[in-house]
């Protein structure tokens, strides 16, 4: 039996940052994740993808962000159980929980924070005949190693941030990048849309809108695509076709825990602390939903911070926590290390 203050289900960026915030409150964390390594989608699906909206980082690769978070939480000595999925939860008479994994490992904690960790992401696939045949033969739903597309002809389909960001990134890798979207308007960040337009004007990206890919051709590998543009059909040659229409997460066994579910996400009380309808169980990051929800990493960091404050009250009933700033109090690691806050220097006015 693994005992901890907070059992975090999910080793993605939100779950990892929750360890840091909990550590500042002297709360011990253990992380459970179905994937074999920490990082969640960042490590599993796109470790080499640049991220542009992390405060203080004009650009950071997803994998590097994970490395930074792991370094940041090392001082708080979190436990990790990777490659196992949360299966069942049992509430105890004292209000604590026992969670059992699919491999029989048991965890005992007064607080559970669900931050993903389900290990199951289904890409939304376009309705194209025989597309399954070409999977791993030129059709890719994720980009883990951009170098695979070095000097290749790549067609990306989609209108969101992933399609825009990868088109921008691969413009300097592939020999030819074509972005296809069924509408003239994109739903990604305005800055990314403007960058794609700049690259189009510079001849580094071909933009085809409104259009859809309706067929794939090739004997053993993708050789060309059939597209429909303004009612007319034509063929474009390519080496890789990457449809980026988003991911559908699967809640798995957690969906049977009695939590309120809305559109495959866990409903939480965002006005307070991101707690679910079961006291002591929180949901943070992309796995939750509430009015005004934004699926952004930085929003997950905020949710993790408030969750830890509420968890402190559950774990230490009746004990008031006084907020301290790390710039004043420093950081005391569970491993005996201490990061000192800079001492204020006061000079007398002569």
Swiss-Prot record:
In alphabetical order, the GO MF annotations are:
ferredoxin-NADP+ reductase activity; flavin adenine dinucleotide binding; NADP binding
Keyword annotations of the record: FAD, Flavoprotein, NADP, Oxidoreductase
SUPFAM superfamilies assigned to the protein according to its UniProt record, in alphabetical order:
FAD/NAD(P)-binding domain (SSF51905)
Q: Which domain of life is it from?
A: Bacteria
Q: Where does FAD bind?
A: 14, 33, 41, 46, 86, 121, 286, 327
User: Is-annotated flag, keyword Transcription?
Assistant: no
- Catalysis performed (reactions): 2 reduced [2Fe-2S]-[ferredoxin] + NADP(+) + H(+) = 2 oxidized [2Fe-2S]-[ferredoxin] + NADPH
Instruction: Report the EC code(s) recorded for this entry.
Output: 1.18.1.2
- The answer to whether the entry has keyword Signal is no
Q: Which cofactor does it need?
A: FAD
Q: How is the cofactor bound?
A: Binds 1 FAD per subunit.
State how it assembles. Homodimer.
Give the family this protein belongs to, as stated in its UniProt record. Belongs to the ferredoxin--NADP reductase type 2 family.
Q: What is this protein called?
A: Ferredoxin--NADP reductase
């Amino acid at each position: 039996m693994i005992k901890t203050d907070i059992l975090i289900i999910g080793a993605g960026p939100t779950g990892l940052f929750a360890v840091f915030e909990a550590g500042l409150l002297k709360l011990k964390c253990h992380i459970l994740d179905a994937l074999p390594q920490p990082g969640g989608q960042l490590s599993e699906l796109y470790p080499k993808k640049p991220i542009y909206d992390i405060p203080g980082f004009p650009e950071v690769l997803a994998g590097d962000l994970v490395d930074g978070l792991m370094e940041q939480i090392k001082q708080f000595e979190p436990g990790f159980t990777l490659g196992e999925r949360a299966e069942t939860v049992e509430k105890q008479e004292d209000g604590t929980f026992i969670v059992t994994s699919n491999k029989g490992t048991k965890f005992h904690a007064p607080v559970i924070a669900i931050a993903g960790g389900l290990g199951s992401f289904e890409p939304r696939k376009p309705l194209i005949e025989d597309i399954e045949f070409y999977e791993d033969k030129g059709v890719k739903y994720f980009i883990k190693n951009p170098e695979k597309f070095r000097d290749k002809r790549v067609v990306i389909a989609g209108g969101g941030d992933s399609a825009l960001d990868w088109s921008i990134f691969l413009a300097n890798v592939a020999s030819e990048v074509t972005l296809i979207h069924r509408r003239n308007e994109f739903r990604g960040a305005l800055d990314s849309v403007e960058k794609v337009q700049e690259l189009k004007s510079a001849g580094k990206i071909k933009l085809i809108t409104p259009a859809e890919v309706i067929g794939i051709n090739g004997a053993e590998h993708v050789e060309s695509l059939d597209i429909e543009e303004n009612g007319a059909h034509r063929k474009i040659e390519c080496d890789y076709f990457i449809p980026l229409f988003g991911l559908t997460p699967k809640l798995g066994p957690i969906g049977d825990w009695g939590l309120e579910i809305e559109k495959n996400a866990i409903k939480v009380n965002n006005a307070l602390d991101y707690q679910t309808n079961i006291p002591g169980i929180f949901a943070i990051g992309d796995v939750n939903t509430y009015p005004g929800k934004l699926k952004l990493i930085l929003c997950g960091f905020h949710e993790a911070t408030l969750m830890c404050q509420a968890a402190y009250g559950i774990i230490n009933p009746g004990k008031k926590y006084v907020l301290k700033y790390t710039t004043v109090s420093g950081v005391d690691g569970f491993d005996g290390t201490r990061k000192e806050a800079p001492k204020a220097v006061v000079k007398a006015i002569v």
